[in-house]
């Protein structure tokens, strides 16, 4: 859990903004959304595999685009 110490004469809005930013960097909200409902292990693996395939296709597309532009 991110900890934000309120500085002397610091407005509440500024401290709240710093806290929100630190929570975002820590990935707390995305973790809460991910754990909101139970997801079967097979579904987790299937989603991870699909994401890996998408990353690989994106990488290949970038490499092919780079090769075309060189000459």
UniProtKB/Swiss-Prot annotation:
Transmembrane segments: none annotated. InterPro entries: Ribosomal_bS21, Ribosomal_bS21_CS, Ribosomal_bS21_sf. Residues 39-71 are annotated as: Disordered. Residues 60-71 have a biased composition (Basic and acidic residues). One of its GO terms (biological process) is translation. GO terms for cellular component: ribonucleoprotein complex; ribosome. Keywords: Ribonucleoprotein, Ribosomal protein. GO terms for molecular function: structural constituent of ribosome. Residues 43-59 have a biased composition (Basic residues). Belongs to the bacterial ribosomal protein bS21 family. PANTHER family: MITOCHONDRIAL 28S RIBOSOMAL PROTEIN S21 (PTHR21109), SMALL RIBOSOMAL SUBUNIT PROTEIN BS21 (PTHR21109:SF22). HAMAP family: Ribosomal_bS21. This is Small ribosomal subunit protein bS21.
């Amino acid at each position: 859990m991110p900890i934000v110490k309120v500085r002397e004469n610091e407005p509440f809005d500024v401290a709240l903004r710093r806290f929100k930013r630190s929570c975002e960097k820590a990935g707390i909200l995305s973790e809460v959304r991910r754990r909101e409902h139970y997801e079967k292990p097979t579904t987790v693996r299937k989603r991870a595999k699909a994401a890996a395939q998408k990353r690989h296709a994106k990488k290949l597309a970038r490499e092919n685009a780079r090769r075309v532009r060189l000459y």
